[in-house]
Design a protein with these regions (language model features):
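Short coil turns linking two alpha-helices in DNA-binding domains
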Residues: 20, 31-34
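Conserved binding/catalytic microenvironments
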Residues: 113-423
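Short glycine-/small-residue-rich flexible loop motifs, especially phosphate/cofactor-binding loops
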Residues: 10-11, 22, 204, 247
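Generic non-transmembrane alpha-helix signal with a bias for helix starts/N-cap capping motifs
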Residues: 6-7, 18, 200, 316
Length: 423
C-alpha cells in the first residue's frame, strides 16, 4: 500500500487475514479499542508510520490467497477521492498479475509456457510506472517500495519467459527498464541504496538492449544522483563520469528540461570537488535551460519523469552546490525559499530537511532544531522517506548538546528505531 488508512486496515484484517478485531490487535501488540477506532474512522485516519510498516509486514507474510483477496477488495471498493487513486493502481497491478503471474505472487515464477505478450501488457506496465511516480511526490518512497518491487518482478518475468514479436519485445524492454528506474528511485528515497544501485544497473542494461537513449540518460542521471548522495558510498568523480556520459547520449534529444537537469547534476559534482568556476558555469546553464523550458515546452509534451524539472529543482541543486562550497548562508536562504514554494509534501519536507541540516552546519542550532521538528512532524504523519530522515543527522548531533534539543533527538531516535536503526 502507498498509505494505509483505517479503511485498508479493516480490509487487511477482515478480508485478507480473516482475523477478529482481538486477534488483529494481539498481532500488532495494541488494544482492540485502537483497532476499532481506526476502522470506524475509515479513510479519514492514517495510523502512525510504525503501524503502517506493521501492516506491510503482515501483508508480506500472508499467503497468495490472502494477497488475492486483499487486491480484489481494493479494486472493487467504491469510496472517496484517495480511494480512486488506490483503485487505479490496484486494478493496474491486478492487470499485470492476470497477464503475467498468479495474483500477488511474490516470486520470480515463470509466466505460463507459450503465453503471448502484446502492446496491452506494455501499456499496463507504463501505467504502473506513471502511478508510482505520481504517488511518490505526495507520500515518499518508503511506503511504495514493496509495490514497485512487485511490479518490477512481474515485468521481468514477462520479459524472460513470455512470447512476443520483436517490436513488442523492444517496447517491453523499455517499459521494464522504466519500472526498474521507478523501483530504484523509491528504494533511494527509502534509504535502500543497495537496491537502488542494482535496479539502476538493470535499467541501464535494458536501455542498451532496447536502443532507448531516453531511458539510458534517465538511468545515468539517477545513478549520478545516487553517487552524489550525502549518505551514499559513491563519489563526485563517479557522479561526474555518469553525468558526462548522459550528456553525450542526450546531445540529439530536444528537451530543455533534460539539459537543465544534466547541467544541474554536473554543477553539484563540480561543487563537491571544490571547483567553483565550473559550478557557476554549469548552474548558469541549468537556469537558462529551465527558463527556456518554462516558456517553450508544454507540460503535455514533457515526459512524466522530467516534469519535476522546474525552477524549484534547479534552485535545490544551486543550494546544495553552494553548501558544498561553504556558502552556508546563501544555501540556507535558497532552501528556505524552496521549502515555502514547494506544493508537493514529499519535496517540501526534503527541502526543509536540507535547510535544517545546513543551519546546523552553520552553527544556528536553535533554528535548525525548529526546522527539524517540522520535518519530523511530516515524517511521523504523511511522508515516508528514510533518506530525508538521514538528512537530519547533523541536527540530531547538534541537538544532543543543546538546551531545548531533547524533544528533537527523542523523536528522531524513535523514527530511526522504526527503520531498524538506520537513518
Amino acid at each position: 500500500m502507498d498509505t494505509w488508512t483505517g479503511a485498508e486496515a479493516r480490509l487487511l484484517r477482515k478480508v485478507a487475514l480473516r482475523m477478529t478485531v482481538r486477534e488483529f490487535a494481539t498481532e500488532l501488540g495494541i488494544s482492540p479499542r485502537t483497532v476499532s477506532k481506526w476502522e470506524q474512522a475509515g479513510s479519514s485516519r492514517q495510523p502512525r508510520p510504525h503501524f503502517q510498516a506493521m501492516f506491510d509486514t503482515l501483508l508480506d507474510r500472508a499467503d497468495t490467497a490472502a494477497h488475492r483477496r486483499f487486491a480484489q477488495a481494493l479494486a472493487n471498493r467504491d469510496s472517496g477521492d484517495s480511494g480512486v487513486d488506490r483503485r487505479v493502481f490496484n486494478k493496474t497491478l491486478i492487470g499485470i498479475s492476470t497477464l503475467a503471474l498468479p495474483a500477488w505472487a511474490h516470486t520470480t515464477s515463470a509466466t505460463p509456457a507459450g503465453m503471448n505478450v502484446d502492446k496491452v501488457h506494455v501499456q499496463t506496465l507504463r501505467a504502473a510506472a506513471d502511478w508510482i511516480r505520481q504517488r511518490d511526490q505526495h507520500v515518499g518512497g518508503g511506503v511504495l517500495l514493496h509495490q514497485a518491487a512487485d511490479c518490477l518482478t512481474r515485468a521481468k518475468a514477462m520479459l524472460e519467459t513470455a512470447t512476443y514479436t520483436p517490436e513488442v519485445g523492444t517496447a517491453l524492454m523499455s517499459a521494464t527498464g522504466d519500472l526498474a528506474l521507478c523501483a530504484g528511485w523509491v528504494a533511494y528515497d527509502a534509504d535502500r541504496e543497495d537496491l537502488a544501485r542494482q535496479w539502476y544497473s538493470d535499467a541501464l542494461a535494458l536501455a542498451s538492449e532496447a536502443g532507448d537513449d531516453d531511458l539510458a540518460v534517465h538511468a545515468l542521471q539517477n545513478a549520478s544522483l545516487l553517487a552524489m548522495s550525502p549518505t551514499g558510498t559513491g563519489s563526485p568523480s563517479r557522479a561526474m563520469q555518469l553525468t558526462e556520459r548522459s550528456r553525450i547520449i542526450a546531445r540529439n534529444i530536444r528537451s530543455s528540461r533534460l539539459h537543465a537537469l544534466i547541467a544541474a547534476r554536473s554543477a553539484i559534482a563540480h561543487a563537491a570537488m571544490g571547483d567553483r568556476p565550473n559550478f557557476e558555469r554549469a548552474i548558469g546553464t541549468a537556469w537558462r535551460e529551465v527558463e527556456h523550458a518554462e516558456g517553450h515546452e508544454l507540460p503535455a509534451d514533457t515526459a512524466i519523469w522530467l516534469q519535476f524539472v522546474v525552477p524549484a529543482e534547479v534552485r535545490y541543486h544551486e543550494a546544495r552546490g553552494r553548501a558544498y562550497l561553504g556558502d552556508l548562508d546563501a544555501a540556507a536562504a535558497i532552501y528556505h525559499a524552496g521549502a515555502e514554494a514547494q506544493p508537493d509534501p514529499r519535496n517540501a519536507t526534503n527541502y526543509r530537511a536540507a535547510l535544517a541540516s545546513t543551519l546546523a552546519d552553520a552553527g544556528d542550532t536553535s533554528t535548525a532544531i525548529a526546522e527539524g521538528v517540522t520535518v519530523l512532524g511530516s515524517l511521523e504523519e504523511n511522508v515516508s522517506s528514510w533518506r530525508t530522515l538521514r538528512r537530519l543527522e547533523p541536527v540530531r548531533e547538534a541537538a544532543a548538546n543543546h538546551r531545548g534539543g531533547e524533544e528533537f533527538h527523542v523523536r528522531f531516535d524513535n523514527l530511526k528505531a522504526m527503520n531498524g536503526g538506520a537513518a
